[in-house]
Regions:
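Generic C-terminal helix-cap and adjacent flexible tail
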Residues: 332-340
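Conserved C-terminal alpha-helix-loop-beta "cap" of PLP-dependent enzymes
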Residues: 251-331
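Short, small-residue-biased leader/transition segments that mark boundaries at the very start
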Residues: 2-6
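Conserved PLP-enzyme active-site core in the AAT-like
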Residues: 1, 19-229, 233, 247-251, ...
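Conserved PLP-dependent catalytic core of the aminotransferase class-I/II
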Residues: 229-262
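A hydrophobic, small-residue-rich beta->alpha segment in the mid-to-C-terminal subdomain
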Residues: 7-8, 291
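N-terminal glycine-/serine-/threonine-rich phosphate-binding loop
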Residues: 10-17
């Protein structure tokens, strides 16, 4: 039904479309409620606004000019990251004030609870590879803390693949990107408890108006979720098999060491870690990464450790033939720079 209308010129009553697609997605995922938003970042901002505004018509229209005593959003310090924009900016857009719990290298359930005050409105948990992973409480632990303090737990799971795990772990609102693991259009998905999702939907007449999602995004994401739930998914072991010849080719290059590494956030994703001994290659890794973007094929890597001479290749969206092109291109750039 949703697929057929995508390719026609149709008019929609947007509130009705939001409600019906949300109910349909919620049924697909076996959750209480769901709604499509413009992106995961908008989902964070609107979720924060939702737990502050709730049913207040006044706050809906005057969120940023009305003092709100209970506006603190508690977040593990190691989750206060920049994912392309600061998490704190999204919280502030939603009217919240960020309060960090624990330390940059650890946050236990006790440390999270210690940051809660009478001014706390919600707990925010960021499930992302950008965040510190070691010595951090998991979503279930955060949910237990939230429940014991009668607070909602908001989980940003933008790039996560499991569309049910964090809801089942006790989160009240969970936010996903429509364009990452789901591979849909630029959009976001918010699922959760009925009351909280309804409060998020109210934000279409508040801050959400500036983050409005169109019918194309709503229907496109709905179709993408349908497909995502039924399509076969490449396992980590299949990724390893695909990248093994690629790694072997790279290990024949002087000063290059490649190996399989697994996703630091715990997902079933295998990647190729490529380490360059710059004393041997004579090439700065940052310069190499930039050069690889400039060829006939623009090749991009995960470059979070490029300053250490390490990059990672995510092979989920490429095939074996394309990996051959990548390894050949790396060899070409290294030889060119070394002989320059």
């Amino acid at each position: 039904e949703f697929r057929r209308v995508l390719f026609r010129s149709q008019y929609f009553e947007m509130k009705d479309l939001v409600n019906k697609t949300g109910a349909y997605i919620a049924k697909l995922l076996d959750v209480e409620g769901a709604t499509v938003v413009s992106c995961a970042s908008a989902g964070i901002a609107q979720s924060v606004a939702a737990v502050l505004v709730k049913d207040s018509d006044w706050l809906l229209e005057n969120l940023h000019v009305t003092p709100i005593e209970n506006n603190e959003i508690v977040l593990p310090k190691g989750h206060n990251v920049n994912f392309g924009a600061p998490v704190g900016t999204m919280v502030a857009l939603g009217g919240g004030r960020l309060v960090e719990a624990g330390y940059a290298n650890e946050c236990s359930a006790g440390q999270l609870a210690a940051a809660i005050t009478p001014r706390t409105a919600a707990i925010l948990y960021i499930k992302s590879h950008h965040c510190v992973q070691k010595s951090m409480l998991n979503v279930a632990h955060a949910a237990a803390v939230a429940k014991s303090h009668n607070l909602p737990l908001i989980v940003d799971a933008a790039a996560e693949e499991d569309l049910q795990a964090y809801y089942r772990a006790g989160a009240d609102l969970v936010i996903y990107s429509g364009a990452k693991a789901i591979e849909g259009p630029t959009s976001g998905l918010v699922i959760g408890k009925t009351q909280y999702v309804e409060w998020v939907k109210r934000q279409s007449n508040g801050i959400g108006r500036a983050m409005k999602v169109g019918k194309e995004g709503i229907l496109g994401l709905t179709c993408a979720i349908e497909h995502y739930l039924t399509a076969s998914k490449e396992s980590g072991e299949e990724m390893v098999a695909k990248m093994t010849p690629f790694i072997q080719q790279l290990n024949t290059l002087d000063g290059v060491t490649a190996r399989v590494v697994w996703d630091s956030a715990g997902r079933d994703i295998a990647r190729a870690e490529i380490k360059f001994d710059e004393a041997v290659t004579g090439v700065n890794t940052g310069d190499l990464v930039n050069a690889l973007k400039q060829g006939e094929y623009a090749i991009y890597f995960r470059g979070y450790k490029a300053n250490e001479g390490i990059i990672e290749a995510d092979v989920r969206s490429v095939n074996a033939q394309q990996l051959e092109i990548v390894s050949r291109r790396i060899a070409e750039v290294l030889n060119k720079e070394k002989n320059a």
